């Protein structure tokens, strides 16, 4: 069994996927727009992302533009990235922080040589944890 996060974006999924390609080296394995699906797309969603799948390291993350009504609910989550060393932690944290908000600066903790939390410019919360 695997847990695969699915991220819903407010009409900026394509931009987010491209950002993760640059910031995290994400490898896109699939990207389909609503206009390419078998059914007629919701009005105004033709060029938005119906489904994207990309790899970050060995993990698969999926995403799309949310065409459903805006709902509020559970928001208590972060994506945690385990990185090999402090240099990778600094690079990854810095890349995700561009246009985002640092929630906890990258620093030494009792459990990690470098740990930090950042909300990227799309509002996705990330925890960067150095494992060595």
Located regions from the model:
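Vicinal oxygen chelate
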Residues: 3, 29-30, 50-55, 63-72, ...
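Core segments of cupin and vicinal oxygen chelate
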Residues: 7-58
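Acidic/polar active-site rim loop that often engages polyanionic ligands
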Residues: 75
């Amino acid at each position: 069994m695997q847990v695969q996060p699915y991220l819903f974006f407010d009409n900026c999924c394509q931009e987010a996927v491209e950002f993760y390609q640059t910031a995290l080296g994400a490898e896109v394995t699939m990207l389909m727009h609503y206009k390419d699906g078998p059914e007629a797309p919701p009005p105004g969603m033709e060029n938005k992302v119906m489904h994207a799948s990309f790899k970050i390291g060995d993990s698969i993350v999926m995403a799309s533009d949310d065409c459903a009504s805006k709902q509020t609910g559970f928001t208590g989550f972060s994506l945690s990235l385990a990185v090999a060393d402090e240099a990778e932690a600094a690079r990854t944290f810095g890349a995700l922080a561009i246009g985002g908000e640092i929630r906890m600066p990258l620093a030494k903790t009792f459990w990690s040589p470098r740990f930090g939390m950042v909300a990227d410019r799309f509002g996705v919360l990330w925890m960067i944890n150095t494992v060595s």
